[in-house]
């Protein structure tokens, strides 16, 4: 799977036009984004029922903790990316997961994800590797620094402050390098850790911000 550790923060660049940003923070070209849409299918079309069940549990868990519902979650040909989120300045325009990856068995998906993301220290540690990508993308759908709604902008002030405090903390544990890329990846990873990993003062604060502003 593709991997990046920083550079341009494409989540901060959404405007009126919809853009597609991958789970590693890369902005897709218009042609690539169109291919994702054109090849999309229902999650229910996946081969293995246990994988479908795990993804649906991930969505349900997110909705329960964060109080946020995302209407469009599908699988598609997303190249070498685990997932893609379509956004504009008004919010999420849909989440698409990698059809090839999630058409494997649960054990295959989890083993691969642990090896490429947890063992390398790239992503935050969680107890639900198969649900990590969908939760990460749901967090992006909930908030990015480019959203222009009043409550999203107000929440952003607190999220950015939390990010700065987190970045200065040399004693924090359970975090990967990806969250340090920018405030948007910090948000997605800290929320994911809070929902599926070991909670701490940063995960608790992030979730409380989402609830406070009803994101």
Q: What residue spans do the PLM features occupy?
A:
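Non-Sec secretion/translocation targeting segments of pathogen effectors
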Residues: 1-13, 188
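Active-site-flanking segments in enzyme catalytic domains
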Residues: 16-215
């Amino acid at each position: 799977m593709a991997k990046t550790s920083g550079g341009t923060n494409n989540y901060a660049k959404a405007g009126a036009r919809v853009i597609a940003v991958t789970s590693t923070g890369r902005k897709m070209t218009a042609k690539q984004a169109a291919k994702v849409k054109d090849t999309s299918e229902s999650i229910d079309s996946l081969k293995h029922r246990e994988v479908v069940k795990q993804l649906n549990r991930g969505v349900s868990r997110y909705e329960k903790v964060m109080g946020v519902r995302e209407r469009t979650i599908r699988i598609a040909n997303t190249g070498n990316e685990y997932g893609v989120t379509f956004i504009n300045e008004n919010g999420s325009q849909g989440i698409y997961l990698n059809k090839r990856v999630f058409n494997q068995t649960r054990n295959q998906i989890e083993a691969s994800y642990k090896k490429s993301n947890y063992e390398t220290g790239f992503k935050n540690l969680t107890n639900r590797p198969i649900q990590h990508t969908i939760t990460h993308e749901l967090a992006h759908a909930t908030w990015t620094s480019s959203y222009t709604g009043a409550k999203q902008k107000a929440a952003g002030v607190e999220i950015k402050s939390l990010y700065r405090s987190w970045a200065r903390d040399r004693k924090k544990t359970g975090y990967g390098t990806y969250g340090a890329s920018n405030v948007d990846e910090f948000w997605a990873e800290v929320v994911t850790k809070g929902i599926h990993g070991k909670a701490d003062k940063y995960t608790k604060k992030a979730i409380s911000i989402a609830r406070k502003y009803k994101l």
